[in-house]
Amino acid sequence: MSAKNDVTGKVIAIMGVSGAGKSTIGKMLGKALSCDFLDADDFHSLSNRDKMRQGIALSDEDRMPWLEKIQESLRKRLLDGETVVLACSSLRKQYREILRGSDPDYKPGSYTSCKVTFVLLEGNAEVIAARLQKRASEEEHFMPLTLLQSQFDLLQADECEKIFKISVVLSPEVIVNTILEMVANSLNP
């Protein structure tokens, strides 16, 4: 177990429903920070991808091995002192707690000292649905529009968690710059 303050790495997790722009923003943010970008979709098993393609929402049983793989990857990077940007839906608090657990010094509820920071890309169902329809027509993703409502139903963003929130209607450049400012301010109060 790491001693307190041995962890020098940081994770900025871009969260939200499918179609919010997590991967686009995450890649841009990773480039701006000169750090690695991880897409949680790359950690999904083939069976999870197949379920989603068929319009079947994942259960917690489906998600747990996926989240644990992500947690393991993040923990290694944090212990190596790396900064990394992660695009991950992170819809429920319990999922975010698993990801926060990648910080060996994290104590449940100590959100401000955790090395994993969450940024929620917020948008209404109509805006996100239009994005998913465009993406589906370009065959760019396995997640169908039919699962969007189930994602909105799962989304939890408790104020006490100190999740940064930003609107998806802003340009990607403005979103990235805003995230950079928010993260800098949170690291240097």
Swiss-Prot record:
The keyword Kinase applies. Gene3D superfamilies: P-loop containing nucleotide triphosphate hydrolases. GO terms for molecular function: ATP binding; gluconokinase activity; hydrolase activity. This is Gluconokinase. CDD domains: GntK. Phosphorylates gluconate to 6-phosphogluconate. Its EC number is 2.7.1.12.
